[in-house]
Swiss-Prot record:
GO terms for biological process: negative regulation of transcription elongation by RNA polymerase II. InterPro entries: AIPP2-like_SPOC, PHD1-3/5-6. Zn(2+) 2 binds at C27, C30, C53, C56. It comes from the Eukaryota. Interacts directly with AIPP3/BDT1. The gene is PHD6. The keyword Transport does not apply. Keywords: Metal-binding, Transcription, Transcription regulation, Zinc, Zinc-finger. One of its GO terms (molecular function) is zinc ion binding. Zn(2+) 1 binds at C12, C15, H36, C39. Residues 122-144, 185-205 are annotated as: Disordered. The keyword Endoplasmic reticulum does not apply. This is PHD finger-containing protein 6.
């Protein structure tokens, strides 16, 4: 029994363990309670000698009569009291309800944290948590911070389910439905950049995605226009002069048919003379009638006419004068080949995508393009030819210039005629 009492007395009333026995200090008053030196709030030599436990420090000073009455108690009862007092309540055990500590509700904890004053503490019985409503129909509610005291209890709050009304989605307009999603995303991104919005993490991926979309759109457009790009070899080379005023402009050009062109147009393009004397005619509403109120594209072009590669000062001035005269007068060039009108227009009248594709291939912004009027309906749109009957009907035959050979002897003859023309001119 003595060994049991001794083991009970050698327990620290702060941590509840025996620990290092040499570091245990006994209370100087009751000689029962013990505490480790490293568990004391203030550890010093004087504290270890005059150590007073918590019970003795709170106990009032006893007079002589009280001490004498204690001595009158039987020894067995005094030993039992001493053993019970040597077992303090550890901190990890639940504090009894008769203690001075009281539980407070989470609402009071929140008010204390915010600095508000609380009136009488109120206690609420935890309510059972109801079944969780479906996702998307409730608003998330911010919970209270968890109390860090050892005796705090978690109070479950019932979340109020708030049913949101269905959001009304407006239908897209027909014009918006025709726009590609990638183009709309790119336009919205460009607007955000224009407003000065800063890029965040992940914008690099979005920028990469927009570039991929633009590249795919351009590739699709290229695939559609590849059959109508200029052929690899030129079919005509010569000079273009104004028949009314030959001295106004005089430039050297070369013509390339489209990769796929009507057979009659291909035959007529080979019959163009070396010296092409054209007549400037106002365009008016001709393009609107020919192309049904839309801008012409590469699929409508039958012959491309590019300036020669000469970069002399005289040739550059003549070339620029031709394009400037057509722009100022809003005119086109007209020439009859075996009774069939050939109309030549400026590159600025094509749609933007066609201009960009030709610029990527030929590295030039200014070029000419021509079409042949092979039908009676197209002849009726041109002033002065409404009663004219087409000499060469369109039989539907299409020439593929990427696979069919060209007549190179014709090109050699064109070179000789040009040399003879230059000699006569000089």
């Amino acid at each position: 029994m003595a060994a049991l009492n001794l083991s009970k007395r050698s327990i620290c009333e702060t941590c509840g363990h025996q620990g290092w026995k040499n570091s245990l200090v006994t209370c100087s008053k009751c000689r029962i309670a013990c505490e480790h030196c490293y568990c004391m709030r203030e550890s010093s030599f004087e504290t270890s000698i005059h150590f007073v436990c918590a019970d003795c420090s709170m106990r009032p000073v006893q007079n002589k009569f009280t001490s004498d009455s204690i001595k009158g108690v039987p020894r067995s009862i005094r030993n039992k009291v001493r053993v019970e007092s040597s077992n303090p309540v550890p901190k990890w055990k639940k504090i009894p309800e008769t203690s001075r500590m009281k539980l407070i509700s989470p609402e009071e904890v929140k008010k204390l944290a915010c600095g508000g004053s609380t009136s009488k503490p109120t206690f609420r019985v935890p309510r059972p948590v109801s079944a969780r409503p479906p996702m998307g129909l409730t608003k998330p509610t911010a919970g209270f911070p968890r109390a860090r005291s050892l005796n705090s209890t978690v109070v479950a709050r019932k979340t109020k389910s708030i049913y949101l009304p269905p959001k009304k989605v407006e239908p897209l307009s027909p014009r918006t439905q025709q726009i590609r999603p990638g183009v709309m995303r790119q336009a919205s991104k460009a607007q955000a950049v224009g407003e000065g919005s800063k890029s965040k993490v992940g914008d690099g991926a979005k920028y990469h995605d927009s570039n991929e979309i633009c590249r795919s759109i351009l590739s699709e457009k290229l695939l559609q226009l590849l059959p109508y790009r200029p052929a690899l070899h030129p079919i005509w080379k010569g000079r273009i002069v104004d028949s009314a005023t030959p001295s106004e402009f005089n430039g050297e050009f070369l013509a390339q048919p489209a990769s796929k062109v009507r057979g009659k147009a291909y035959i007529l393009s080979k019959a163009i003379p070396v010296l092409l004397k054209v007549k400037l005619v106002p365009i008016g509403n001709l393009l609107s009638g020919l192309f049904m109120n839309r801008k012409p594209g590469l699929s409508d072009v039958e012959m491309y006419i590019f300036p020669d590669d000469k970069n002399t000062k005289r040739f550059t001035a003549e070339r620029d004068h031709i394009f400037e005269a057509m722009r100022i007068r809003n005119a086109m060039m007209k020439f009859n080949i075996n009774g069939t009108p050939l109309l030549i227009f400026s590159s600025k009248l094509l749609d933007k995508s066609s201009q960009i594709i030709i610029k990527m291939q030929k590295k030039t912004n200014n070029f000419l393009w021509g079409i042949f009027l092979l039908t009676k309906k197209s002849l009726a749109l041109l002033p002065g030819t409404s009663n004219q009957t087409p000499q060469h009907f369109d039989d539907g035959y299409v020439v593929d210039n990427d696979t069919e050979p060209f007549f190179r002897r014709y090109h050699r003859n064109c070179g000789k005629q040009l040399q003879r023309h230059y000699g006569q001119r000089d």
